Regions:
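Residue-level signal for inorganic ion chemistry
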Residues: 44, 82, 104, 127, ...
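Glycine-rich loop-to-alpha-helix module at the N-terminal edge of alpha/beta enzyme cores
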Residues: 45-137
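Rossmann-like NAD(P) dinucleotide-binding subdomain of oxidoreductase/dehydrogenase enzymes
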Residues: 138-284, 411
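Terminal low-complexity tails and localization/encapsulation signals of metabolic enzymes
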Residues: 1-50, 84, 88, 138-163, ...
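A short hydrophobic/small-residue beta-strand
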Residues: 186-188, 366, 451
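ALDH superfamily catalytic-core signature
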Residues: 238, 246-391, 454
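Conserved C-terminal structural/oligomerization subdomain of aldehyde/semialdehyde dehydrogenase
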Residues: 45-48, 236, 274, 329, ...
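Short, well-ordered beta-strand elements within core beta-sheets of diverse protein domains
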Residues: 46-53, 70-75, 162, 273-277, ...
Length: 496
């Protein structure tokens, strides 16, 4: 990565020719019907016209996945053989790392350095990790009686529909695809219509890695068309979705209206980040708070968008965050020196600006940012934004913004901080900064969040699960626990 200059990436972008058709039954399907434009948020230009899939294309993909599961070799392979196929796919992603990072940066606006170093590394690691896990899953044989034998086996659920958003198009896809394939399932992936190109490339690489036809299918299309068709399809056994809470509710309804398929949801967040006066390093806490909210343009479900600071240190911490916001380099996502890129599309930028206007109208104090920037580029760029004096019942404090907007709330007592942290419909993640181990345990238990980071933020590993409480979803991605989403437990009782 270090040897690629801004001009290198611009030259590569000029030569980039990603696939633009669906990947169904092991082959690229160019499609002859309607298409939609993929517009780059870096400059507002169309980078590709992609086949627009709907119920017909989803039907073909599900049929291919059904055949591959019911009659194909994949679920019947030795688990070690499935694992080797996943590791071959990881190797191919590694070989095409620059191309995929460039594609992601172009289609959704994140800095190329983050796409290459963080997103692609995560996707590669995920396929390798589950490839290595595939043959490590053991059945159970509990002792039940002297004259009987019981066996508990874990069997693949069947056809999995995976629907993923645009903010981490390959990382989030890999978190669903890799454990599902390791378990022996087949998959139909529907990426966001805002970032389909990297997923379509992944489908092509899966075929090159030797995955049998129908094992991994990719259909491009929007939510009302392809997403709804996948959610309602009676031959889909499991639906795994990452996205907004509102759309997650749709998938629950689709399940109820079709075959009661299992639905796993990783949804929105409004994550609190609590800084106490005894934090081991207040400067580090402030720097991490700034990094967390501005990373990936704040377009993250786990973004620490609510900074809860003890009143005695609120001014110091807030000033440090503001200083970092003002020096953050916002620019062309293809420039390796860019620290914050473009928001995914103009309409999303307008939505974020609406939240900023509402914050000011509801009495919050805008300390820095809050306006468009780089307006001559044609792209959708926003200044890093910080509010303080935010009312706990305001939109800034309660609604997911999904942009680089930080709300600072001061508190006086620890119980008040816990109450503020939990005063939201979401429960995805939270942060806490303290030197007291007892406080860390007490607060972690009290916070209704699937992940609590203490003296850090956004740390993780594939060995630990990820997911939310309350309206942030159900089930868990990552770790061995993700296998539970794509398998069924069967009891076989044999009377001797």
């Amino acid at each position: 990565m270090a040897h690629h200059t801004h001009q290198d990436w611009l030259d590569r972008a000029a030569r980039l020719r990603p696939p633009t058709g669906h990947h169904i039954d092991g082959a690229d399907e160019p499609g002859g019907g309607p298409s939609f434009a993929v517009v780059s948020p870096r400059d507002g230009r169309t980078i590709a016209e992609v086949a627009d899939g709907g119920a017909a294309e989803v039907g073909l993909a599900v049929a291919a996945a059904r055949r591959a599961f019911d009659a194909g070799p994949w679920p019947r392979l030795a688990p070690a053989d499935r694992g080797r196929a996943l590791m071959r796919l990881a190797d191919l992603i590694e070989e095409h790392r620059a191309e995929l990072a460039l594609t992601i940066s172009l289609e959704m606006g994140k800095p190329i350095t983050e796409a290459y170093e963080i997103e692609l590394r995560a996707a590669i690691t995920t396929f390798r990790w589950y490839g290595q896990l595939a043959d490590k899953l053991a059945d159970e044989a509990p002792h039940v009686a002297p004259d009987a034998f019981a066996l508990i086996t874990r069997e693949p659920s069947g056809v999995v529909g995976a629907v993923v958003p645009w903010n981490f198009p390959l990382t989030l896809a890999s978190w669903k695809i890799a454990p599902a394939l390791a378990a022996g399932c087949t998959v139909v992936l529907k990426p966001s219509e805002l970032s389909p190109l990297s997923a379509l490339t992944l489908g092509r690489l899966a075929a090159e890695a030797g995955l049998p036809p129908g094992v991994l299918n990719v259909v491009a299309g929007d939510g009302p068309g392809a997403g709804r068709a996948l959610g309602l399809h009676p031959d889909v056994d499991v639906l795994a979705f990452t996205g907004s809470t509102a759309v997650g509710r749709h998938f629950l309804r689709y399940s109820a209206d079709s075959n009661l398929k299992r639905v796993w949801l990783e949804l929105g967040g409004k994550s609190p980040n609590i800084i106490l006066p005894d934090a081991p390093d207040l400067d580090q806490a402030a720097a991490t708070a700034a990094w967390g909210i501005f990373f990936n343009q704040g377009e993250m479900c786990t973004a620490p968008s609510r900074l809860l600071v003890h009143r005695s240190i609120a001014e110091r911490v807030t000033d440090a965050v503001i200083e970092r916001a003002r020096t953050l380099r916002v620019g062309d996502p293809l420039d390796p020196g860019t620290e914050m890129g473009a928001l995914v599309r103009e309409s999303h930028l307008d939505k974020v600006l609406g939240h900023i206007d509402a914050g000011s109208d509801q009495g919050a104090r805008l300390r820095t940012g809050g306006a468009r920037t780089l307006t001559g580029t044609g792209g959708s760029y926003l200044e890093p934004t910080v509010f303080d004096r935010v009312a706990p019942d305001s939109r800034l404090a309660r609604e997911e913004i999904f942009g680089p907007v930080l709300s600072v709330l001061a508190f006086d007592e620890l119980d008040e901080a816990i109450s503020l942290a939990n005063a939201t419909e979401y429960g995805l993640a939270a942060g806490l900064w303290t030197s007291d181990l007892s406080t860390a345990h007490r607060v972690s238990r009290a916070l209704r969040a699937g992940t609590v980071w203490v003296n850090c933020y956004e740390e993780g590993d594939l060995t630990v699960p990820f997911g939310g409480m309350k309206q942030s979803g159900n089930g868990r991605d990552k770790s061995i626990h993700a296998i539970d989403k794509y398998t069924e437990l069967k009891t076989t009782w044999i009377q001797l």
